[in-house]
């Protein structure tokens, strides 16, 4: 549990929290995005802004709000870039069009808001047609205050073999980044109807160059529990050439300390369903403990389109699904995230 004296930096320099303020080299990406899961599994959302050097005046953004009954409100696009500077003159704001992120206190408190329209769709429609025609629109107003609940995790920092894997081509799929679990409260207003909520979430800060050529899939899961325990993992599937694949995880136990772990059982993506999917996992810590965490999704969202694929895009490039799940660890339940991707050739599609 985070307190006023609890170190939430994880050793990451404070200036990593500040956004890139001036136009960088073409291709460099500076992104802030969050996953948010309502504490009772009634709905969940993903919101993000991606600032790209060669389109600096109009940052990209994405939004999905998914309800447990299968309703989805979705928007992809770009917008007029907000000033990166907060009231104190520091580069604490990443915003564009209807989306705004603001760092209030590094590694402790962030705000996110969305005010605009979103297209009506459903989890089933996205399975059948991820590039669906946007014909029905809904007014949407979101405001969330996020309080960080654990120190950030920098992928590649916990296991030597993970650092080695990310030091090569596999690191280009992810780009330099860290992620931090949080708890939050906020309001969700859909067509004038206001709903107040409490939730759990994961915040990602990513700055650097990113490439996807050669990417072959992944499984990424994380959550924080009411008693302060938490876990996270990210793993790429075993390689066809038998070479080492990136695989890294961790737990935070009741003592508040992060213990590195290796994923030994994960729920690879094999088919698209709308929810109710078993996404249980097993981690093996470096001190020899086997940690089993049960998981069941309460809503699954196949990743939307929103960008023009290059003409040389591989036919077997991985398909992506973002989902939100109930996780249970030694009898205690919470809500958290899971994102997976797999090549169509290994899926039931």
For each predicted feature, which ranges?
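Structured soluble/peripheral alpha/beta segments that form catalytic or ligand/cofactor-binding pockets
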Residues: 1-349
């Amino acid at each position: 549990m985070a307190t006023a004296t609890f170190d939430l930096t994880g050793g990451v320099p404070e200036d990593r929290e500040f956004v890139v303020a001036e136009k960088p080299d073409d291709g460099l990406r500076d992104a802030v995005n969050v996953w948010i899961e309502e504490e009772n599994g009634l709905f969940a959302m993903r919101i993000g802004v991606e600032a790209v050097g060669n389109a600096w005046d109009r940052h990209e953004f994405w939004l999905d709000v998914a309800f447990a009954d299968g309703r989805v409100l979705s928007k992809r696009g770009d917008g007029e870039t907000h000033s990166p500077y907060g009231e104190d003159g520091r580069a604490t704001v990443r915003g564009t069009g209807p989306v705004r992120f603001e760092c209030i206190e590094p590694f402790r408190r962030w705000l996110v808001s969305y005010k605009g329209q979103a297209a009506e769709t459903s989890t089933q429609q996205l399975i059948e047609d991820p590039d669906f025609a946007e014909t029905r629109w809904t007014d949407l107003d979101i405001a969330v205050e996020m309080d960080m609940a654990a120190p950030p995790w920098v992928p590649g920092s916990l296991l030597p073999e993970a650092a080695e894997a990310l030091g090569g081509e596999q690191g280009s799929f992810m780009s330099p980044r860290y992620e931090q679990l949080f708890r939050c409260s906020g309001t969700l207003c859909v067509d004038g109807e206001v709903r107040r909520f409490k939730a759990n979430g994961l915040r990602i800060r990513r700055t650097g160059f990113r490439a996807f050529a050669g990417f072959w899939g992944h499984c990424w899961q994380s959550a924080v529990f009411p008693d302060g325990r938490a876990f996270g993992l990210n793993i790429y599937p075993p390689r066809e050439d038998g070479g080492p694949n990136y695989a890294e995880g961790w737990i935070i136990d009741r003592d508040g300390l992060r213990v590195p772990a290796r994923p030994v059982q994960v729920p690879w993506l094999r088919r698209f369903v709308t929810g109710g999917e078993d996404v249980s996992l097993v981690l093996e810590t470096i001190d020899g403990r086997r940690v089993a965490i049960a998981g069941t999704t309460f809503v699954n969202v196949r990743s939307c389109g929103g960008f023009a694929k290059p003409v040389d895009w591989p036919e077997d490039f991985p398909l992506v699904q973002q989902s939100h799940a109930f996780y249970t660890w030694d009898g205690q339940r919470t809500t958290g995230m899971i994102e997976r991707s797999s090549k169509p050739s290994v899926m039931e599609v």
